[in-house]
Amino acid sequence: MLDIVENSTNGFNVIRGGMSYKHNDLRDMSLYKAYAKFERIPVFANEPVFDTMENLSDYSAVFNVALGRVLNMRPISKTYNLVSHQSAFDEQAKQIEDSNFDDRRVEVVDRLFEDGKKAHRTVYFTDLKHDINSRSIDDAVVPRIDIYNSIDMSWAFQIFSGAYRDLCRNSLVFGGQKAYHQKRKHTRGLDVPAMIGKSVLSLEMFDAQRDLMNNWARTILDAESFAHILRNTLCKKPEKKSADYIRPDARPVNEKLLEYLLEQFFEESKELGETVWAGYNALTHWSTHTIEARGKENQKQHDIRRKRQDEVRDVITSPDWLSLCEVA
């Protein structure tokens, strides 16, 4: 079902099933601060034989601090990745500010549903326009990024970016085109910064090089060909003397990174097919996925991200990549 967005006022508005708030500040989290601040609390069960309360240590209830009440929902397990709405949207704001969209005017629509358990944020880049194929006189649509999140296991964490008029959570968009879409369950492996980073980078490319992006989305790339490109670029180690190798014929390849990128390529291919666009998204996932570097001495996340983006740029401008994509 399509979301109904009210456009008439600039305060908190009542919409079907919840509340909405329209504003122009990526850092404005007032709706979530007022209605959706969560924390885990213990769950106890009554032991009937001895009439005692037992702590279910592997599960938690969720307390809405903003509303001062326990949410009516199933307990969540200790492996459930409880992503707060505010932390996800703060991360999005930071990455947009670090992107080519940092000086663009935005319109933000925040929505909360069911006592704050579900959230949907849309960021419109209002001074950008893209034409779409239609019979109407006004074919221009505004590029946007949509994020869906829940804290009660009802919605997966899901991101769309592109230029389209409407969308629904079953991955369809209407009146336009997606640049990026991905959804993940709230498991320990959910990497919110990486997903947000890919949505922003994909929209940047959609805005600046839409024809190239469409070419990549149509061009077939199998895992073997992708691995060949990686061995000659990103995963290629510096040259060493043959005496440094246990086997003189061993190829100087970072096998761990190669395996990681191929695994990510398989994940991207589930949504995008075995295409060059899936390969590019696997590369951008790595360039924005810096969790493994957190806490290391003298390593700053933004520096790591910039360095990796430069390395991705080297891959997509390499002879193997350009030849595959038939880009002059």
Where is each model-derived feature located?
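Intrinsic disorder/low-complexity polar-acidic segments
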Residues: 90-328
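Feature for intrinsically disordered/low-complexity regulatory segments and propeptides
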Residues: 1-91
